[in-house]
Amino acid sequence: MRNFILRRLLQTLPMLLLASFIIFLLFAKTPGDFIDGNITLTAARAAELKAIYGLDQPLLTRYLNWLGQLLRGDLGFSLQYQIPVSQLLNQYIWNSFLLASVALVFYWGIGLAVGVVSALRPGSWFDHLVSVAVFAAMSFPTFFLCLLLIKWFAVDLHWLPVGGMTNTGSDESGWQYVLQVAAHLALPVLALVMLQAGSLTRYVRASMLDVVKMDFIRTARAKGLQERTVILKHALRNALLPIITLLGFELPGLFSGAIITEKVFNWPGAGHIHIDSLAARDYPVLMGFTLFLAVLTIVGNLLADVLYAWADPRIRVRS
């Protein structure tokens, strides 16, 4: 397993290099930037600022300079916020991690449990109810679902706060602060779970339906094993093999998918500043966040490969 992980780590290096070049090239060739979009600047001042930030240099030189900065942990300087991009992301990225990780735990738990039960009772009222609920939740646009949840739980019922991370002017600490953040976290997490759990439930259901019809499941039952052991130890582990592949897309998908959710609920995360930077054409911030998503994609696929090799030792042998 150690050699398998080491080989996978070495394979990620050229992918990271290629991803950094593509990201830089896309933003470098995008028309306009923060300086060009500022109509208050004179042509001379705009040229001076481009020289200061190195935007007047050849494309390859700019990429090599940016790559050198990346290797030193420097993502550049935000033109809009006037602070280093790494410092800016560090202020907001952990709030996004909190939102994404809580949503991930909930919708994987719900998706696995509901998908397994639905597969064990195909054609039942529960299976039909799950199918209707899944397709209904997946059919809602993200912004509309978020606004609907705000209308129901915040405006009409007054159960949960509308948005933000804490109450305005709050100076709570300790458990009071934790409970306050949890209350503000509930609605965005609920929105992400409703949007993401449906597809996972369908994948788990389809995979479990295929596995429970296989010969080794009938053999396990014929040996007199308890149904719980057959399902959890034999069927579920094999059904999870194709689902593990989804994990590689879940990490970046949660952050990119939460951009609209963070904006609607005014959650102070990286997705929130990403939209603001997009409107201001603050390319250093956009490049840093996009590179972060690329790294998450590669790390997610690496994690999926490791989990796949752990679940199916034949993968390690073939590799």
Predicted features, each with a name:
Residues L16-L25, F135-W152, L247-E250:
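Hydrophobic alpha-helical membrane-insertion segments
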Residues D56-L112:
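An internal, D/E-rich "acidic patch" concept
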Residues R2-F4, L13, N90-F126, T142, ...:
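Alpha-helical transmembrane segments of integral membrane proteins
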Residues A43-D74, Y177, I217, F265-S277:
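Short hydrophobic, aromatic-rich alpha-helical segments embedded in or entering the lipid bilayer
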Residues M15-L64, F153-V178:
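Hydrophobic alpha-helical transmembrane segments of membrane transport/permease proteins
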Residues T30, A137-F140, F255:
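Transmembrane helix irregularities
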Residues A51-L60, D74-V85, T166-L185, L278-P284:
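Membrane-interfacial helix-loop-helix junctions in multi-pass membrane proteins
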